[in-house]
UniProtKB/Swiss-Prot annotation:
Enzyme category, top tier: hydrolase
Site, as annotated: Discriminates between blocked and unblocked aminoacyl-tRNA: 10
Protein name: Peptidyl-tRNA hydrolase
Protein keywords: Cytoplasm, Hydrolase, RNA-binding, tRNA-binding
Active site annotation, chain numbering: 20
Provenance organism: Streptococcus agalactiae serotype Ia (strain ATCC 27591 / A909 / CDC SS700)
Amino acid sequence: MVKMIVGLGNPGSKYNDTKHNIGFMAIDRIVKNLDVNFTEDKNFKAEIGSDFINGEKIYFIKPTTFMNNSGIAVKALLTYYNISIKDMIIIYDDLDMEVGKIRFRQKGSAGGHNGIKSIIAHLGTQEFDRIKVGIGRPNGRMTVINHVLGKFDKNDEIMISNTLDKVDNAVKYYLQTNDFQKTMQKYNGLK
């Protein structure tokens, strides 16, 4: 069986470590101690890495389409590698959740997230597994765009690092158990 773990974000160094790139940050944390090297594939518009875990080929994906067109890369890779939607997890930021909180869902609307809107539009379904990482709402007069494209406050950096460890543990637990429902029950709502 083959699986695909996708972290959403924006390509380019100016977006490194921004809140909107929490999906890329999660992928980097997950592969940190694995034998994964990323190569940018311009045909698929993604950085692609892979490894074998428990005898299964796992693809780790960071779309380079920019957030709002993430569905282009996701659809192309699912099709090319013949991966079922049920064997894919999307990791992304959520404005409506407290900073550092994680939530697992098996289906649902985009909730205003343009990357998820793109994936839903290209796949033709809302039924795919996802891990949402809370980045909180902007304070005061800050716009949503400035908030999501901003970096985490110093106060939040340790919490986000711990959150990324939890996402790493959850994904590896899922890959061991092959059971997203069980993973949800164990890790949902952690902070």
